[in-house]
Amino acid sequence: MEGPEIKAVEAVIDNGSFGRRTVRFETGRLARQADGAVAAYLDDDSMVLSTTTAGSSPKENYDFFPLTVDVEEKMYAAGKIPGSFFRREGRPSSEAILACRIIDRPLRPLFPHTLRNEVQVVETVLAVNPEDSYDVLALNAASASTLISGLPFTGPVGGVRLALIDGQWVAFPRWSERERAVFEIVVAGRVVESGDVAIAMIEAGAGKNAWNLIYDEGQQKPDEEVVAGGLEAAKPFIKVLCDAQNELKRLAAKETREFTLFPEYTDDLYNRIDEIAHADLDEALSIAEKLPRQERIAEIKQRVKDTLSVEFTDMDEMEKDKEIGNAFKELQRQIVRRRILTQDYRIDGRGLRDIRTLSAEIDVVPRVHGSALFQRGETQILGITTLNMLKMEQQIDALSGPTTKRYMHNYEMPPYSTGETGRVGSPKRREIGHGALAEKAIVPVLPSREEFPYAIRQVSEAIGSNGSTSMGSVCASTLSLLAAGVPLKAPVAGIAMGLVSGDVDGQHIYKTLTDILGAEDAFGDMDFKVAGTADFITALQLDTKLDGIPADVLAGALKQAHEARKTILEVINECIDGPAEMSPFAPRIITTTVPVDKIGEVIGPKGKMINQIQEDTGAEIAIEDDGTVYISSEGGEAAEKAKQIIDEIANPHVPQAGETYKGTVVKTTSFGAFVNLTPGIDGLLHISQIRNLADGQRIDAVEDVLKEGDSVEVVVQGVDDRGKISLAIPGFENQENNAGGRRSDDRPRRDDRRHSDDRRRDDRPRRRSDDRDRDYDDRPRRRRDYDDDRDYDDRPRRRSHRDYDDDRDYDDRPRRSDRRRDYDDDRPRRRRNDDRNPRYVADENYDEYREGREVRHERPRRRVRRDFDPFDD
C-alpha cells in the first residue's frame, strides 16, 4: 500500500566494526483513526505499532495526569502459539510490564502535569527478530506517535540500549552480542535548546557474564567513570533518533489541540496558606521520625482548613478542599527544597552525604533456607532465600531472549509498611519493577550452575518503608543469600540518590542527596538508584520529574553513591563475611556426569530406571542433554546413594563367577526367577536352585517361594558368552540347575540336537517335494498339476463359481443388484434371515411365526469335520 499519505523517515545507527542498525518510522498506513500512529522498524525485521489517543473530555475528580502505557506482546510476532490453556494472549508478561515502565518514565514529565484528559499509549509488537529486543524500539515508537498526535507534548524522546563489548559501546546490540557484554545501559533523553542531550531515564546493569569477563579475560570494569562514559556515548545516538522524529513531525504531525488545564490551586489561596502555616510547617518538617512528623503536619493542615472555611466563600466546598490540599503540599515542597538549596539542611537534620542508621541481622526466620533483616532508618526489608533443584527454574515464554531464569527475585510491599490499608494480592507494576532491579543487581555475582547447581528464589518483604526499599532489598538479599550458603562472588549493596535543583542568587544549581527519605523522593527531582560491589556497578536506575538532567550531574551522583555503597558493605561484612553452612532444611544437590550414549540407560524405557532410582533412594534426579546429572535430596545420604547407582549404570561392573550379591526379584517365570544384581544387570535363578530355599522340597510354582520385590542372597554361578548370568543359592553353587543331571551350561544347543556333533546345522537334509531328483523350484504347484513346459503365469485364473461364456467379458457378468427378484410394490420385503432367525420378525407376527416355524436355536448345530484337509487328493 503506497500513497502520498504515507510518510517515512530513517535513523541510521553506526556501530563501527559492529555494523549499522536502521530504525525507520512510518505513519499513514496503519491505525488511521488513532490520534497518532507510527510503525517503527528495526532493520525491517522487527516491527512495533505505536498508537497514542487522548480522551475527549477531562476526567473528573482526578488530581493527577492520567497517562497509561500498555505493551501488547503478540506471540505470532515470534512465530509462536501461546502456551496458555486458551491458546491466546492473556495478562501481560513481566517483560511487557518492564517495557511499559521504561516508556512511561521518560514520557510523563513531558506532558503538562495539570492535564486531566486521559492519554493512552499502546505498543503492539507485530514482529520481532529472535536476536533483538523490542523494548527500546517501542520507546522510540511511543515518542514518535505522541509527537504527531496533536497533544501538548514537549518531546521527542530518543532511547537507545548500549552494551559495553570488548571495550566499545554498541547501540542496539543483538542477544548473541550481549553474551559478551560487561555492562548494558538503556538511556532515554531529549535534545535541549543548546543542542546538548538531557537524560530523562536510565535502566542499566552488568552483564550476567561480567564477572568472568572482567576477572578471567581482563575486560574493563564498569565502575563510575566507565558508566559515566556510557551516558556520554548514548548522546549521539539519542540525537539521531530525535532528529528523525522531528522530521516525521514536520511531515505528518497534526496541529496541537487546545486542552483545558486545571491549575491545582490559585495564587491567592497559596499565599494565604503560606501566611497561616509557614512557620509551623518549617518546624514540623524538622521532625526526624516519619509518623510523628506526619501527625504534626496533619494537625497543621486541619487548622488551615478551619481557618479558611470562612474565607473564599465563593468556591465550591469540594473544590476548596482539593485546592487547599494541593497548595498545602506545594508549600511543604517549597520549604524542603529551599532549605536544601540554601542551607544544605534536610528533613531529618542530616547532611547531603549522610546515611541513616544501618543495621543487619541474619537467621531471623526459623526453618527457611536463608533469612536476613536489613534496616536503614525506618526502612525495613526482610529477605528470604529458598533453594531447590534446577528443574524448578522459571520457564519464560518470551518473544526473544532467555527462556529460563535460575535466580528469581520477588519484591513485595504490603500496605502496612507505610501504616496504611490497601489491596493485598497479585503484584503491581511497581513491585515487578523493583524486583527486576534487585534481581539485576545480584545476578552478576551469582555462582555458575556448575559451581552451585540450585534454582534460587529470593523474596524481599518491604515490611517498613521510608525511602529506597528497592535498594534495601539488594542489601537484604546479599545477607540472606550468604546465610543460605550461596557462594556469592562478592557482596552487593545499593543506595538511592536524590536531586534538588533550583535558582539561587540568579544561578541554577543542583544538590545531590545521599540515602533519600520518602518525602525527599516526593519533593525532589530525581530518584537515582545505584547498586554494586566495592569495585564496580551492577545495577542502575534513574527516574526524574525534570525534562532531563545533565550528564555531568549524574556522573557526580555516581561518585557520591560509591562512597555510600562502601559504608553499607562494611556493615554487611561485619554481619556475615562469607557463605554460611547450608541449612539442614535445604536440599543437598550433587552432580555427576554420564556419557551421552548412556543417558538412555539411566532413564530407562519410559523413565522406568530413573523413576525406580528415585523411588528407592528418595532423591530427585535431573539429567541435562550433555550428560550432567543433578541429584537432590533433603539429606546427603540419599543423594550419594542415587549417585552410586547412576555411576554403576554408566560404568557397570560385570559380575564374575563366585561373587555374592543381595539381589531383588524383578520377574518370575515357570523355570525360575530373574534377580536384579546391580542397576541394569539381572541374572537367572533356576527353579532347581529355588528349591533349596524350600529345604529341597519340590515346588509347583516359583511364586510359592519367591515373589517380585523379594530380596534374596545369590552367588554368581557362571556367565556365558552372551553375557547371560546364572545364579545359585550360596552353598549350592555346584548343584545342577535341571532335573536331567546335567549343568544348564552344558546342555546341547538347539542347533546340535538330533544331529551328529561333526555335522553342521546347515548340512541337514532339506524338506523337499516327493520327487527327490527334481530341482526344488520344479516341484509341482500346490493343488494343480501344470505342464512343466507351461509358464506359471499361464495357469487358469481363479474365477467366480458361476459359468460365463468365454466370449463374454468378465465385467459383463450380472451384478448382484440385477439378480434380485422383481417384487410388487405391495409385497412386503423379506427381512434378513427371517425364515431362520426370529430376532428379525416383526413383533405383531412373532407369535404366528413361533407356531408355524422352528426356532433356529432349537435345531441341532451343524458339525464340522476337524480332520478334513481341502488339499488332500
Swiss-Prot record:
Mg(2+) binds at residues 521, 527. GO terms for molecular function: 3'-5'-RNA exonuclease activity; magnesium ion binding; polyribonucleotide nucleotidyltransferase activity; RNA binding. Its EC number is 2.7.7.8. Keywords: Cytoplasm, Magnesium, Metal-binding, Nucleotidyltransferase, RNA-binding, Transferase. InterPro entries: ExoRNase_PH_dom1, ExoRNase_PH_dom2_sf, GPSI/PNP, KH_dom, KH_dom_type_1, KH_dom_type_1_sf, NA-bd_OB-fold, PNPase. Residues 727-873 are annotated as: Disordered. Its cofactor is Mg(2+). GO terms for cellular component: cytosol. Involved in mRNA degradation. Catalyzes the phosphorolysis of single-stranded polyribonucleotides processively in the 3'- to 5'-direction. Belongs to the polyribonucleotide nucleotidyltransferase family. This is Polyribonucleotide nucleotidyltransferase. The gene is pnp.
